[in-house]
Amino acid sequence: RSCLSDTIDLGELVSLEETEELKELKARYEKMYSNNRKVQALDATVDDFFSSNIYAIRELPVTIKVRTVASGSTTSNSYLFCDGAGKEVTLGNSSTSLGSRFYLKILPATSGIPYLIYSSASNTPLSVGYYTNAPDDKILMTAKDNSGSLYSAGWDLIPSTYKGYFSIQSESYLGQSDPNNSWSVFYHVLEAKANNKLGYAQRVNYRAQQEFLITPTASFTLQNVTFDLENATISNGAVISKVTSLTNVHEYTTNENLTINFNAEETSNFYETAGTLKVNISSPSSIKFPRPRPIAGKAVLMGDESKDAIYSSATQKLSAPVEYSTSIEMKPRCLLQLTTKFKTFILNVPYVAVAKYGDREIKVRGTWRGYSVADPELNKPINEPHYF
């Protein structure tokens, strides 16, 4: 089983309570950091929608998956799992069972607790705990009910450099890394251990056993996309060459009108930027967006574009009819082969997408990438005549 209930040899499973030692460690920590509650780990790598997005997923079911299990554990057992109240939370292989569902509660800032994490199976908070016959071996457990103290149930989520992953830091369980240095105080973070168990350790950057992917099971439905045209970049693409042959059988110069028609293939891709929080966005096939066009070196939306771009990172190919009319001077009694070169452009346009689940709204950033044939009326093609 992936969730262990109380056993006789280990004793009773109980939640961590505040001790004089923990009080002293916390006092030293706060003094060391000028009375800040803790060192803030958030930095410039955290996207500007993280706070609003994580608030939007509050109390929605999430799965919590460790990036890499510890040596001595089953590789497929990477999801937090527990099937009831007052039980140990361990690692299981299911991402769909009720036991692998959890949800976040966000308390007011005045509470001093950033997050509570609840088990959907027990509807009680996760907390630091231990078995009475092994008090030094702290584990993760679900509270027996909702009537007790939340002292050991407070958590903070510290974003990893791996987008979507977090260190899950206890707000109550402190330690001292060097017994000879009373100021070497730290907050423990959750860590995957051997035998599919969970324990705690001092946080180490990039340690895969300390990083957990928190993913809402709900899919947010795309509502709209707003392009940041001012910060778009445009580069030249490969020209499209079309050859037209004409003859003049007369003994004098003539001017010939000609029209070149063809269908070009344009492309569209929406690439989401990996955010601090991983969310799933679905886009119905009925929702389509206009594509920015290249005009005078800028990406623009004139308002008359057809809505034909679907929200997908897969390359969408679109047919673009091109028509170009011009006149050319024909020398007497000649064959003309006219090469007309049409300009193309590659556009990279930042965007913000808004998606909803019920009344919950999340936002993500991304880049739309498009390959576009220039309008020949606005970007004149190059004509290269060859007379024979």
Where are these regions (language model features)?
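Short hydrophobic membrane-inserting alpha-helices and related fusion/pore-forming segments
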Residues: V279-A299
